[in-house]
Each structure stands twice: as C-alpha cells, then as structure tokens.
Amino acid sequence: MSSGGLLLLLGLLTLWAELTPISGQDRPKKPGLCPPRPQKPPCVRECKNDWRCPGEQKCCRYGCIYECRDPIFVK
C-alpha cells in the first residue's frame, strides 16, 4: 500500500474512533451530579460519555477536561 493510502486509512480510522456510537445516543444519563473540578493538567480526556466509565461513575466535563468520577448526590 502506498504512503498516501496509509495516510488516508489512518485518517479514516482516527475519525471513526472519535465518533460517538449511535447505540449510545439514546441511553439516559446516570444519576447524580459531578463533584467539584479536580486539579489536573489541561485538556485531559478520559471518557466521552457516562457509559464509557466503570460502574456508577459519570463522565464529568470541566472545561476541556473529561474524566470518570464518582457522582455526588444532592438532597
């Protein structure tokens, strides 16, 4: 395969990996709220949505930071 073909394949794979699966769009969000913003380096992306986090954890957004966190519940 030529280098141009490899670059095209790599680009398509990158776009495919960034797309949210259609099957996950209709899922409800997990209960609870995200806790206060953590002290982390800028723009860390551990997850894309709640269903990419283990157990009860939620995918929490803090600016450009996305990470799996245990939810908090407010009464």
UniProtKB/Swiss-Prot annotation:
Residues 1-24 form the signal peptide. The keyword Secreted applies. It is found in: Secreted. Pfam families: WAP. Expressed by the venom gland. Disulfide bonds join C34-C60, C43-C64, C47-C59, C53-C68. Residues 27-72 form the WAP domain. GO terms for biological process: antibacterial humoral response; innate immune response; venom-mediated disruption of cell wall in another organism. One of its GO terms (cellular component) is extracellular region. Keywords: Antibiotic, Antimicrobial, Disulfide bond, Secreted, Signal. Its main location: secreted. One of its GO terms (molecular function) is serine-type endopeptidase inhibitor activity. InterPro entries: Elafin-like_sf, WAP_dom, WAP_four-disulfide_core. Damages membranes of susceptible bacteria. Has no hemolytic activity. Not toxic to mice. Does not inhibit the proteinases elastase and cathepsin G. Belongs to the venom waprin family. This is Carwaprin-a. It comes from Tropidechis carinatus.
